[in-house]
A protein has these predicted regions:
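Extended, low-polarity transmembrane helix blocks
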Residues: 1-100, 107-188
Length: 188
């Protein structure tokens, strides 16, 4: 295995340029991170279905109705818990999106969309779990959200994933990503 290929990262923002040269093996770390996060959220989603061995029927009522008053989302979560229709929708959306995010990350397809969805879901869990203590400001849910953002930023789907192939599908003689450049925000 050759590790002589050098990667280069560069970003300019607000007049500041930051550059870096990560080790060539960093691509394997990104793939591993994509698989681990994909597996984690896939199993979390599957565990919310009663038909899965070891799974249990998911009900968000207990979580939404017991958010600590210091949480910035306590009011909106309590309102969600009071609406039977909205609660039914949430009970379907959370496990379904977790399964879809997991599959997307593991296969490397639509990784940026999946990473955004994962980060958003973790941020909502983080805000719902915060009880106002500053020592609990940085917990595992926030770390998960940041890792999802990193996977999207690194375009982890282009590294050993299906996004590298999806982007090159030819549509009317040109690669999909060139024909529809806005797809760069979903793929990668």
């Amino acid at each position: 295995m050759s590790t002589t290929t050098q990667n280069r990262l560069e970003s300019r923002y607000g007049g500041i340029t930051i550059t870096g040269t990560p080790h060539a093996l960093s691509v394997w770390t990104i793939i591993a991170l994509r698989f681990v996060m994909g597996g984690m959220i896939l199993l979390a989603g599957l565990g919310k279905y009663a038909f899965v061995p070891g799974g249990d029927s998911f009900d968000a009522f207990g979580y939404l109705s017991n958010v600590h008053g210091a949480s910035p989302v306590s009011g909106i979560y309590a309102t969600m818990a009071e609406s039977a229709v909205l609660l039914d929708v949430i009970n379907v959306i959370i496990p379904l999106t977790q399964v879809l995010i997991g599959v997307a990350l593991i296969t490397g397809a639509f990784v940026r969309l999946a990473a955004f969805g994962g980060a958003l879901q973790m941020l909502m869990f983080y805000l719902g779990g915060w009880e106002g203590e500053w020592l609990a400001l940085f917990d595992s849910t926030l770390v998960y959200a940041v890792v999802f953002v990193a996977l999207g930023a690194f375009a982890a789907g282009r590294i050993g994933g299906l996004d590298a192939y999806i982007e090159q599908i030819r549509v009317r003689g040109e690669p999909l990503i060139e024909r529809y450049p806005k797809l760069r925000y979903l793929l990668g």
